[in-house]
Amino acid sequence: MTLDISKYPTLALAETPDELRLLPKETLPTLCDELRTYLLNSVSQSSGHLASGLGTVELTVALHYVYNTPFDQLIWDVGHQAYPHKILTGRREQMPTIRQKGGLHPFPWREESEYDTLSVGHSSTSISAALGMAICAEKEGQNRKVVSVIGDGAITAGMAFEAMNHAGDVHSDMLVILNDNEMSISENVGALNNHLARVLSGNLYTSIREGGKKVLSGVPPIKELVRRTEEHLKGMVVPGTLFEELGFNYIGPIDGHDVVELVKTLKNMRELKGPQFLHIMTKKGKGYEPAEKDPIGYHGVPKFDPAHNSLPKSSGGKPSFSNIFGDFLCDMAAQDPKLMAITPAMREGSGMVRFSKEYPEQYFDVAIAEQHAVTLATGMAIGGYNPIVAIYSTFLQRGYDQLIHDVAIMNLPVMFAIDRAGLVGADGQTHQGAFDLSYMRCIPNMVIMAPSDENECRQMLYTGHKHQGPSAVRYPRGNGMGTPIESEFTALEIGKGRLVRQGEKVAILSFGTFLANALEAAEALNATVADMRFVKPLDEALLRQLANEHDVLITIEENAIAGGAGAGVIEFMMQEKIMKPVLNLGLPDKFIHQGTQEELHEELGLDAKGIEQAIRHYLAK
């Protein structure tokens, strides 16, 4: 449903940044109010990321007002906060389609708009990319400006500091804006800091500063005195020492919701040379009281009525796989005081809220630091404890070297609880868990499990926790199948699958939660179905039996076909000289766009109907 733009008269005048820059500066506060209301009304009808965007309205307006986008390059880290950017860059009328199949991408996306300089989704990439662009802009000599906007969560990642360290060394012209919405980090926001920011970014101060450096460069004691005096002035009111040490000129913190002050400061900073760092303070969920009070709950929202001041409650029903994992942690920790659970900033998403409250001494949130999370688990395993790393499939990619070098080579008992495996839906290409089976299957010592339902997931988590070596249990986003969950723990025999349905001629080997679809297709085909359970090691005895008793084998998995479980089946059969045709069903060799999980399964032929059709087509060849 498209919103009536006539209710937002100032916003109606700013469909693009070129139009925005024609507005008088005194109209910008009104524009921000209308943009914030428009964003709230739009996302409440479409679902999507809300609280982050509400907090960056003034910053977005100020950036596009001051900088000549898209010639000047603006990079949003992660991209949750970029909805106002999309609204102001010609995509206002398409906002109702965001995160939907065929609609606007959930994050800034290069293919979608010339204003989206960098395709994003994972955190902490913006400063590295911005530095690369700044180096090229400097070589081209076109006076192109480059700006990176990064949040206080994303900046904690090592990659961000690696980039800032390098930027301070090469000294290219670029601006990093820290969007800080954690008031505990810096509370001194107000008139003094706004005034100081203007002073520190103004022409008089910068000319004295740069001139003083040149004039006094041959007199080290005096130069040091000037520097220390400047740092003393700034240190009284700003927490910028770290960024200065990395080679940035630090300015702030300033009020990120005062659009006029932002414009003044950005205009000053636009002309500065070398790496600049602007620290702004914002409130996540700004302007909508329920989101201000619960920014985590309103980070990503379903459709809701803003007038009700609350989000719709889930209808209960089948538990999510994330909750299955969270319950397992609590039940297991009651038996095992040496269980240690680690998450890289995904407490809520991974179902660990209850565990973090009931077992705080056994819970470790390492922030956005996947590499550290994995090697922290290594140290805990060496120390005689039983670590579990709870991580999304797409984010484990960031800790791949540590998985090999720090866990698998030493054959340490670290279990990886891999959430969001397979297609996650609305977050699109950057978040689909399409590759974990492929990138783990080639690692020696790994035991890899793929449950078909929620009870199997619980028992596999127990199996992995008890296994004296590296293991992984991968499970999808969303709810289970309604299978009864056994409270008692039962360790599964490593590398053993199970026969679920006996048929003839065709055998379907299911890895993971496509088992229900496979069974439905098998009814129409009178096919045999096996729940393989283990991707590594494969149940070789069951494989031989199925190959001997059937004409065709079909493998199905919610992972890339290339290098996945089905590829492992073919490798084994070729090694054993078992010459039977094999059809691999799974995710194709492309990055898969957004849509609901159901829509994507149907499109890719991985629902029951699609599986049946694919098998019939293969048999007809």
From Swiss-Prot:
Reactions listed under catalytic activity: D-glyceraldehyde 3-phosphate + pyruvate + H(+) = 1-deoxy-D-xylulose 5-phosphate + CO2
Essential cofactor(s): Mg(2+); thiamine diphosphate
A biological process from GO: 1-deoxy-D-xylulose 5-phosphate biosynthetic process
Binding site for Mg(2+): 152, 181
TM ranges: none
Keywords: Isoprene biosynthesis, Magnesium, Metal-binding, Thiamine biosynthesis, Thiamine pyrophosphate, Transferase
A GO MF label: 1-deoxy-D-xylulose-5-phosphate synthase activity
Pfam families in the cross-refs: DXP_synthase_N, Transket_pyr, Transketolase_C
Pathway annotation from the record: Metabolic intermediate biosynthesis; 1-deoxy-D-xylulose 5-phosphate biosynthesis; 1-deoxy-D-xylulose 5-phosphate from D-glyceraldehyde 3-phosphate and pyruvate: step 1/1
Enzyme Commission number(s) from the entry: 2.2.1.7
UniProt remark on cofactor binding: Binds 1 Mg(2+) ion per subunit. Binds 1 thiamine pyrophosphate per subunit.
Annotated InterPro entries: Dxylulose-5-P_synthase, THDP-binding, Transketo_C/PFOR_II, Transketolase-like_Pyr-bd, Transketolase_BS, Transketolase_C, Transketolase_CS
Gene Ontology terms: cellular component: cytosol
Enzyme kind, highest EC tier: transferase
Residues the entry annotates as binding thiamine diphosphate: 80, 121-123, 153-154, 181, 288, 370
Gene3D superfamilies the record matches: 3.40.50.920, 3.40.50.970
HAMAP family cross-referenced by the UniProt entry: DXP_synth
Family of this protein: Belongs to the transketolase family. DXPS subfamily.
Subunit structure: Homodimer.
Protein role: Catalyzes the acyloin condensation reaction between C atoms 2 and 3 of pyruvate and glyceraldehyde 3-phosphate to yield 1-deoxy-D-xylulose-5-phosphate (DXP).
Protein name: 1-deoxy-D-xylulose-5-phosphate synthase
